[in-house]
Amino acid sequence: MDIYSKLELYDAIHRHYSRDSELITSIAKRAGNPVLELAAGTGRLAQLIVDLGYNYTGLDLSGEFIDVARAKYGKRTTFVVGDMQQFHLSKQFNFIFIGFNSFLHNLTDQEANRCLNCVRNHLTKDGLFLVSIFIPDPSFLYRETGKLYPATSLFEYDGSRCRIMETNEFDDETQVNQLTWRLERDG
């Protein structure tokens, strides 16, 4: 299942995720205005910055996701369609962050370096940069191939209580973990 092609499902899955909220808010307060989020998706984390009264810019590769984010926040924020590996904005930011494992969409060292170079070019001299990434336990990477494991708790979607089940396949050589998600309705 490609959750990036189902915007309502993407939002439903991530709606209640908040483990990163306190850290992002704390660092934003320390860094100050303005703030840039890379891989902003539909804007789940934008509200944290808006609530601080800061100028927020969100960048995402998906024009559809950016359209949803713009509809949610209107003129209180700026959302830009762009690639975190090669963006050129006309200003610098005191705080740049990439939330919820999105940095891991850079699948090679070259892609990661391009992203980090763009961040460096857009970060003020004393600015702060936060990357949230998943560091898996090896037992997660080497789970039984083809076996379904719960990936989310129950959530509401399309009038039903649902959960995501996943399988994964880890490639030792490339260090890429390929997840496949399946939506299951409860009951």
Which residues fall in each region the model found?
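Conserved class I S-adenosyl-L-methionine
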Residues: M1-N33
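Class I SAM-dependent methyltransferase "Motif I" SAM/SAH-binding loop
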Residues: A39-G43
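Class I SAM-dependent methyltransferase SAM/SAH-binding core
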Residues: Q47-Q86
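A short acidic, Gly/Pro-enriched loop at the edge of an enzyme's catalytic core
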Residues: H88-F95
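A conserved beta-strand element that flanks and buttresses the S-adenosyl-L-methionine
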Residues: F97-G99
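A short glycine-rich, Lys/Arg-flanked "PGG" loop and its adjoining helix->strand segment in the class I
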Residues: N113-K125
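Conserved beta-strand signature within the Rossmann-like core of class I S-adenosyl-L-methionine
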Residues: D126-I133
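SAM-dependent methyltransferase
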Residues: I133-G187
